[in-house]
Amino acid sequence: MTAQLELVLRKYDLELTPDEQVTIWDEVAFYHEVNQSYFDQDEDEALGSPQEDERLIYEIEDLVDSCITKESKTRTITFSEDQLWIIHDVLREKEELYSSTYDRYQDEDDLEVVDKEGNLIGIWGDIYKKIKEAINGQH
């Protein structure tokens, strides 16, 4: 008796405004830039899969609009589960950074990104909520 391995690729549809698309592009590109040393590592030296993560980042950048034009519109974009987790991790890292700096310095400018409890707000919070709902199966 032979066992068959079935590969299940989970896909998630997110309805994103032009602003949300540009924000995702900006955040993922910035994350890629500031973590370049991780992406430059050999697979056997790194924790994780730098080349795979970098490939996913390029795919995300290809899916969303990088700038708003007069033709920009809200679109439903289909992401793979791995792509969605990359965006989730990028936003979670932003949330952790801004909440920790607000806790230390009480800088009101940080409150444009996180609330006093340290949760993402504004466009970042909207995107983060959509991703968490998609991953958790809530529509």
Name each model feature, range by range.
Residues 1-139:
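Positively charged, low-complexity terminal tracts
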